[in-house]
Amino acid sequence: MSRLRRTAPVLTLGLVAMLAACTAEAGPPVLTWHINPDDGGQERIAQTCTEEAGGEYVIQTALLPREASDQREQLARRLAAQDSSIDIMSLDPPFIPEMAEPGFLSPVPEELQDTDGVVQGAIDSAMWGEELVTVPFWANTQLLWYRESVAEEAGLDMNEPVTWDALIEAAEEHDLHLGVHGALAESLTVWVNALVASAGGEILVNPEAPSDELQLDLDSEQGRQAAEVVSRIGSQGLGGPGMPTADENAAMNLFQGERGSFMVNWPFVYTAMAAADSEVMDDLAWTTYPRMDAEIPAAPPVGGINLGVGAFSPYQDQAWEAVECIVRPEHQAEYFLTDGNPPSAMEAYEDAELQEEFPMADLIRDSLEEAEPRPQTPFYNEISIGLQNTWHPVSGVDPQVTPGSSQQFITEVLRGERLL
């Protein structure tokens, strides 16, 4: 009999007997899918795929911590201990290389390696090196949300690409606030990475190198351009009085205030503001992520969740069959409708109900095609925290100093010469 595979702290004798029966030879294997917190959509998909499996397997879910960094820590620790109870994992893209490099992930079967019809940003974030090591589930990107009345008053043609300079000038001239993310958190790394990438640069040059050989390129013209945007917004208070602690939710609240104007944020804000019956909804519009240069397309952020299978699971074949079911386009479309998380499959965006519920759906899909991942390296955690520590508070960012000092600090951390 397989060893007990459950996360509940207390089990009754009856439940133990039931689980033992499930894992016995006569019953289907019970797959544990470790999920990030949502509004119940992953649990519903698990139930649907269990029913569709026809007795081949049963999927149960186990809830991971709310913060992505805590999810990473828990999964990495358990996989390092060769925990066989981890069958399927919902993985935040930046932490995938850290799981793949030491062999914690089961190889993706050939039949699931076909990425035709998947948005490019999700494909890029599912890779480690040249290999697809996870399967895209849902994908996320940031749009530029704005008040139509403000854009009109500022004389901005929002049918044309808009730049950060134009947004900053509009906020300065009309005494308005910009919804950005200045908190000492992952959201700050997301913002800086998008600015550097949109300027044509990259934070990390050689992501597959060992930690002591990694080369950063923050100390560059593109890094200084990114710092200039952050500095202008931070030093002039354009991000509002709460900018040092402003995460995505704070930016949304600021946007709904009297001096709200423009905001970069994930699509969750649309359903959140609609659910709150916000007065802003009548004046709300959206477009692609701001450009650094009017002639160069932006590189929007990409996030979401990819699915991996634990290398120590005794049920890897069944787990991959379950993954194939979970990521079906119709399930992704339903998940967008119930939980507000956009699909990675282009086909899902053709769903009529989805199109009606999310009028910006096509823009999200197109943005995901242009999106650039954060540095794909097993040492992402060190890079992200190091960047946050050196670019916060944003009011203190100096375009001539911060990129270089940040690069030096992170490099010393990676080489073991300095502690975070």
Roles of regions detected by a PLM:
Residues E152, D366-L420:
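Conserved C-terminal helix/tail region of periplasmic/extracytoplasmic solute-binding proteins
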Residues A76-R78, S85-D87, T115-S149, I296-A299, ...:
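A structural signal for short loop-to-beta-strand junctions that line the ligand-binding cleft
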Residues E152, R232-L238, A274-D339:
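Extracytoplasmic/periplasmic substrate-recognition and gating elements
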Residues A171-E172, S211-P244, Y289:
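Glycine-centered hinge/linker elements that transmit conformational signals in sensory
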